Amino acid sequence: MFRNPDINRLAVHAGLRQLAWGLAGIFFFAVLLRAGLSPAGAFLALGAMLGLRLVTRPAAFALIRGAGLRTAMLVGCVLFAGQFPVLALVDAGRPWTIAAYVLAVAIADVVYWTCYHAVFAAAGDVGERGAQIGVRTVVMVLADTVAPVVGGLLLTWHGWAAFAAATVVALIAIVPFRGVSVPDVVIAEDHGPAPFRDGVRLFATDGFLMCGFAVTWGLIMFETFDRRFDAFGGLLGAAALAGAVGGLVLGRLIDAGHAARAVWLNLAAMTAVVLLRVALADTPTGVVVAALASTALFGLYVPTLMTAVYNAAKTSPCAVRFHYRAEAGWDVGGIAACLATAAALAAGVPARLLLLAALPALVVQAILLHRRYLAATPDAPTGAALAGRID
């Protein structure tokens, strides 16, 4: 894959983690609905999860400082695996089970994702970042094409088996990570918020989009197919396959020096995704067409965003602090999306119209990305943009 063995190991780890997520975790919102929560109630539960992540973040940072990045990452991996048995227990008739799931996911996420992003940012290579993220995305997409199909069938026939399989695979994902040479990261000094501002703003837009637009689309798909796990999982798998090519193509485009151009290409693609999903969300056939066609375009999104984020983290004074603060921004954006979506659904606004809220967020994100990519090439000659080296 790459000359960098640590990136290869992290890609395998990410693939196994995504396989575990696809077997059970990807269905979390659907499980909450089947457990008896209303759509608005499920969004409030997700918002509570993000709120808890936000307030427990200092404790996670203390763990990283005290135990080190490698140990904290291993703890995060175990906690990530532990969320699936708790999800199996959720029942709206027993509110404590939902509270337990919210707590389990919040603690797992706040430790795992801060560590994972910091490790990937520090271990990766700036000159190959886009391609490395693109390949990682393809590895994860391969997992996403299989796991939701299998997970949907298991949840339909023997629900406990899906959660057990996800737990085992998540624990196996620890094995490739143990071979990664985790870079030393100095986190004792507080550098203030300024060096990390780009990450916070970019992740806030991503949190808003993922918790609003992406989850709402999942709700539409699940409801369209009468809340059947098997049909929902099959559609998720087929849609994931359609998104693989975009990630690879755009990752190479970024590495070739066309990052700024890729930003606007991604904005156009994501705008088309939003409009396509809104237009076709009324019928099962339309939902299938929109899911397959739009996910192919959605494959451009992750490399465009995360190349900028990881490169900013690597050049920041501290990659751990960068992602600690950036993840907090993600939580704030996600909470805003969850509260707004829950209120709109409770007021009777059709879910398909709520997808349009993604459009202004995408514009803001594109502006931030464009500024970030241009700022990352301060020594480029005046004519570089016309020559195609930074645009």
Question: What is the meaning of each model-derived region?
Answer:
Residues V110-G124, W217, G299-T315:
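Intracellular juxtamembrane helix-capping segments at the cytosolic ends
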